Amino acid sequence: MLRDNNVPQYKNNSDYKTNCKAETPTKRLCESLFSFERFYFFLRYGIAYVDHPNGLQKHVMRYPQVFATKAIERHLDKGEQKGIIWHTQGSGKTALAYFNVKYLTDYYSQQGIVPQFFFIVDRIDLLEQAQKEFTRRGLKVNPVQSKEDFAKLIKDGVTTQNKEGKLEITVVNIHKF
C-alpha cells in the first residue's frame, strides 16, 4: 500500500513502526470495531431505512444504542427478565426501541418465543410522535384506545396482530394503566 501511494519511505519512520504494534489504541479500536461479530451485528441490526417526507433516509445505530442493546443481551443471557436503560432527551429512545424490536425478535425466536413489545409514553404528543416514527421505520404500530383494550391485550397474550408478518409494537400512554 505504501508503494502504491508512492510513499515507501514511511515504512522506516518511527511513527509507522510504533503504530504497527499490537498495543496501540488505534489498532485495538480498529480491530474491535471491525471484528466479524460486531460488524455482522451492525449490518444485521444497526441500520434502519426511514420513510421520511423528504425521501428515504438511512439511519444507523449510535454507539450508546449499540452498547444498550449489548447490555440487554448480557442481562438476558444471565437470566434476568427486567432492567432499565436510562436515556436523556434527544438520545434516541424511539430509535433504540425500533432497533431492539428487530434484535429481540431474533433473540427470542432462537428460544421458540414470539415476543410482544410495548412502548410506553406519558404524553399524547409523544404517543403520536412514536407512532409516526415506528411506522416510518416499517413497524406495524398497534395503538391502544382504552384501559380495557390494554388489559385485554396483556391478558390474551396475543403477540402478533397482523397477517403480513411485519414486526410490530404497541404504543400506549401510561394513563391507560
Task: Please place each PLM-identified region on the residue numbering.
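ATP-dependent helicase/translocase motor core
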Residues: 1-121, 125, 129-141, 165-166, ...
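Inter-Walker segment of RecA-like/P-loop motor cores
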Residues: 138-177
